[in-house]
Amino acid sequence: MARYRGSVCRICRRENLKLFLKGDRCYSDKCAFDRRSYPPGQHGQRRTKISDYGIQLREKQKIKRMYGLTEKQFHLTFKKADHAKGITGTNLLVNLERRLDNVIYRLGFADCRTQARQMVRHNHFTVNGHKVNIPSAQVSIGDTIEVREKSRTVAVITNAMEAVARRGLPQWLELDKANFKGVVNAYPVREDLTMPMQEQLIVELYSK
C-alpha cells in the first residue's frame, strides 16, 4: 500500500486525536484539529455507531499513521513483536519507538517523524560514527545518534532543536544539544508513552 500523500491534518481529525504530524504547527493556533475536531467530509459531524471491529481498525490506523508506516511495514513490525518474548502489544510500541526516524524526532533533530524519515534517507545522521540511511533501523542501548558535521547548519535541524522543549525529552534518551548528538540510555517502557493508545485492540485485530 502506498504512503499517504494527502493533508495530514485530516488524519488527526479522522482519528479524533492530535497526532502531531505537522511539527510546530500542531502547537499553534493554526492547528486544524483545534479548530475542527470532528471527522472530515460532508457528514463528519454526524454521530455514527461503530462496531468492535471498527474500533480495533481505528486504533491500528491511528498508531500506524502516527509513526508514518505503510500497512506492510506496520504488519511486519507487529509480526516481529508477536514472535518476541513478552507482551505483544508492548513489544509493538517499543519497536516503533526504537525506529531511527522516531528517535531522531524524539531527540528534537526533526520537527516531525515525516521530516526525520526524509533526513535519515538524505544521510544527515550517523549512528555510532557510521552513516545510516534506513529510517526503520532499530537503535540499541548505548547507541549514539549524531548530526553529521556538514548538516549542523541545516535550517530544519536547527529550527527543530529550538522547539524541542515543547515536546520534552523521553527519559530513555539523553541529549547533548551543544554537540548535536543523543544517546540511547535504555529501551522505552510502556509508561514512557503518554499518547492515548490501546495496543491490545491491535493484537485482537490481527488475531482474527
Curated annotation (Swiss-Prot):
SUPFAM superfamilies assigned: Alpha-L RNA-binding motif
CDD domains assigned: S4
Listed GO MF terms: rRNA binding; structural constituent of ribosome
GO cellular component terms given for this protein: small ribosomal subunit
One annotated GO biological process: ribosomal small subunit biogenesis
Domain (S4 RNA-binding) ranges: 98-159
InterPro entries on file: Ribosomal_uS4, Ribosomal_uS4_bac-type, Ribosomal_uS4_N, S4_RNA-bd, S4_RNA-bd_sf
Pfam families for the chain: Ribosomal_S4, S4
Keywords from the named record: Ribonucleoprotein, Ribosomal protein, RNA-binding, rRNA-binding
HAMAP family: Ribosomal_uS4_B
Summary of the function given for this chain in its UniProt record: One of the primary rRNA binding proteins, it binds directly to 16S rRNA where it nucleates assembly of the body of the 30S subunit. With S5 and S12 plays an important role in translational accuracy.
Subunit structure comment from the entry: Part of the 30S ribosomal subunit. Contacts protein S5. The interaction surface between S4 and S5 is involved in control of translational fidelity.
Protein family per UniProt: Belongs to the universal ribosomal protein uS4 family.
Name of the protein this chain belongs to: Small ribosomal subunit protein uS4
Gene (name only): rpsD
